[in-house]
């Protein structure tokens, strides 16, 4: 008989311990599979705001790093930018989920994302024993940008031109957790506001990451009452067209498919409002959230 089963039946006192052991051991094949691999995590939503969720996220990330996974965090902070802008008398406007960014707004973006939000995350990870390093797109050419396609409406919103993977790899090899703020600059020294989902996508592709995981505030992609377990490109285009996918979910979904096309194998959207959702996603047999797949009914539908 399986020794774990006999423990369950012979001593009820030991049953809870055995159950915990069973949960922990379920992680072993995944730890073996992912050791030395790179995960890019887009950190956003409540998991960046609520104290309990922030701490649980930081513990999860630290644990992933400690078991040998190269974790690269790319953070958002759209709400924080909006609040800082308001205090300075600037009104935020969005076009298809992207912030209209003039000269004043780019200053607010830079000081909020790179100055405050980034450093708060670094401190949080450090508190939990994760050795994190704050990186903005400007450090060591981490994110070189070009003006985005809708520049006449959006202003200084950039697209990623290139990523300095050597620098990010160097940090990972040193056992550090790069925490990247999504601002970039171009050859003329102009600074650009880059949507964090787009930045995460480009970084995941450039690093040839094993996974890109979006941590957001939703259980997954919602259609009516249903949360989709998988979504393919054609469905997503229809849902955007019909307004079923809207606002900040549009850049997330578009960047997810760009990442899939760019060769990253697994892309997940998980709920940051759910404590330890990251660990559950990676280390248990049951996947959660929505997985992005190229086409419906192909073999990519298996979990992780
Ligand atoms: N079909 C949909 N399914 C889930 N969320 C959606 C959908 N359409 C629009 N949304 C909205 O998109 C938001 C996520 O985008 P955003 O706020 O930019 O996330 P984050 O700040 O985590 O990057 C959700 O909070 C939700 O209100
Ligand atoms: C161009 C653009 O819209 N940039 C975003 C950058 C931050 C971000 O993406 O934050 P979330 O992930 O929290 O939405 C912004 O200014 O809000």
UniProtKB/Swiss-Prot annotation:
Domain of life per record: Bacteria
InterPro entries: AceGlu_kinase-like_sf (IPR036393), AcgluKinase_fam (IPR004662), ArgB (IPR037528), Asp/Glu/Uridylate_kinase (IPR001048), NAGK-C (IPR041727)
Catalysed reaction equations from the record: N-acetyl-L-glutamate + ATP = N-acetyl-L-glutamyl 5-phosphate + ADP
GO terms for biological process, alphabetical: arginine biosynthetic process via ornithine; L-arginine biosynthetic process
Site keyed Transition state stabilizer: positions: 42, 252
Pfam families listed in its UniProt record: AA_kinase (PF00696)
Binding-site residues, substrate: 77-78, 99, 193
Record flagged with keyword Kinase: yes
Catalytic EC class: transferase
CDD domains documented for this protein: AAK_NAGK-C (cd04250)
EC number per UniProt: 2.7.2.8
UniProt-annotated location(s): Cytoplasm
Any one GO MF annotation of this record: acetylglutamate kinase activity
Keywords for this protein: Amino-acid biosynthesis, Arginine biosynthesis, ATP-binding, Cytoplasm, Kinase, Nucleotide-binding, Transferase
Pathway: Amino-acid biosynthesis; L-arginine biosynthesis; N(2)-acetyl-L-ornithine from L-glutamate: step 2/4
Chief subcellular location: cytoplasm
Keyword Amino-acid biosynthesis: yes
GO CC annotation: cytoplasm
Function: Catalyzes the ATP-dependent phosphorylation of N-acetyl-L-glutamate.
Entry's family note: Belongs to the acetylglutamate kinase family. ArgB subfamily.
Name assigned to this protein: Acetylglutamate kinase
Organism in which the protein naturally occurs: Chlorobium limicola (strain DSM 245 / NBRC 103803 / 6330)
């Amino acid at each position: 008989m399986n020794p774990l089963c006999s423990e369950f039946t012979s001593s009820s006192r030991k049953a809870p311990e055995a159950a915990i052991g069973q949960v922990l051991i379920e992680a072993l094949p995944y730890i073996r599979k992912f050791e030395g691999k790179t995960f890019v995590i887009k950190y956003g939503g409540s998991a960046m705001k609520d104290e309990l969720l922030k701490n649980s996220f930081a513990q999860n990330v630290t644990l992933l790093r400690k078991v040998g996974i190269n974790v690269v965090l790319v953070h958002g902070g759209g709400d924080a930018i909006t609040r800082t802008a308001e205090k300075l008398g600037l009104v935020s406007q969005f076009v298809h989920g992207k912030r209209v960014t003039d000269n004043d707004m780019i200053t607010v973006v830079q000081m909020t994302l790179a100055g405050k939000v980034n450093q708060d995350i670094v401190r949080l990870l450090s508190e939990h024993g994760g050795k994190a390093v704050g990186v903005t797109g400007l450090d060591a050419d981490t994110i070189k940008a070009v003006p985005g396609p809708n520049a006449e409406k959006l202003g200084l919103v950039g697209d990623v031109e290139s990523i300095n993977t050597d620098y990010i790899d160097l940090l990972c090899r040193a056992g550090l957790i790069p925490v990247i703020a999504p601002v970039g600059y171009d050859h003329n020294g102009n600074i650009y506001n880059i949507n964090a989902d787009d930045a995460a996508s480009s970084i995941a592709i450039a690093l040839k990451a094993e996974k890109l995981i979006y941590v957001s505030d939703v259980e997954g992609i919602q259609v009516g009452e249903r949360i989709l377990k998988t979504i393919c490109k054609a469905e997503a285009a229809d849902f955007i067209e019909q307004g079923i996918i809207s606002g900040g979910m549009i850049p997330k979904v578009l960047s997810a498919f760009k990442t899939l096309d760019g060769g990253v194998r697994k892309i997940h959207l998980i709920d940051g409002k759910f404590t330890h959702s990251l660990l559950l996603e990676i280390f248990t047999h049951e996947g959660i959230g929505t997985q992005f797949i190229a086409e419906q009914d192909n073999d990519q539908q298996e979990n992780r």
